[in-house]
Amino acid sequence: MKNTQLPAHSRVVKAHGAGNSFVVATDQYDDYDPSEVEVATLCSPAFGIGADGFIRAVERDGLWFMDYRNADGSKAEMCGNGVRVFVDHLRREGLVDLPVGQTLDVATRGGIKRVTPESEDEGQGASYRVDMGPAASPARETIEVRVPGIDAVLGGIWVDMPNPHTVVELADEETLRGVFLPPVDVSQIPQAQRPFYDPAPQAGTNLELVVDLTEPGAERGHIAMRVLERGVGETQACGTGCCAAALATALRRGPGAPTQWVVDIPGGRVIVGLDGVIDWSGESPRITDASVFLTGPATRVAEIRLP
């Protein structure tokens, strides 16, 4: 039976990707399976280190596996900002030899993700490009969403990255700034303060609130986004959410929409690539098997020795 707690005096790392923060632990030989309680405690800013999620680095069958947990301890399919932090951790710890421009395959619950370092750390984190794999979406608004503080019923586009996302477009940045998003999982707040979905996603959903800032004729799209993460609350960034938000905004724009998107989140900026992801040739758009790409920073904050 595996240990459910980190051994005494274990060393962990605090790191972030565009403000999306993580506690990272190396468990190369797969000796440790953390309980939900331990993960939630480590991620608690009051009782632990404080983070949006927990990452365990495990080597299995010649591949590095990113065991990602939400801040409440629940297991998640993937984390786009987390996978950059994960590979940055492997490089800094000397667990892989991965020069700039070379690619590493990373195993996740959401499949293999290919990660390429694009630059070294120059004070604001090293930059990594992630092949996030294909998205899945009905490519239209299929969910009605009510957001506390906004009177209107909003249309949501469902995107699977492969974790679930519902993307809602707002009118302007003032509205985006004024929305209340809780800093904790919605299960911990009154029903009246929670977003409402119809139909309600069975496995829950991340909620992305987006404003399209794209200038007329611009080659790159530009959006501002806030995110309410499933099992966490509002975070400074969400990599898979940025991908979902860019894709949904492109779908709303229609044929001729940009395929490169700048995404501004509270924690910084990332770039999403959608080349070949949307097929506009039919009567309605279709999501192809082409990969979505995510580029952004990974920054180490601290090395911590547990008691």
Predicted regions and their residues:
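Active-site proximal loop and beta-alpha junction motif in alpha/beta enzyme cores
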Residues: 1-78, 83-237, 246-307
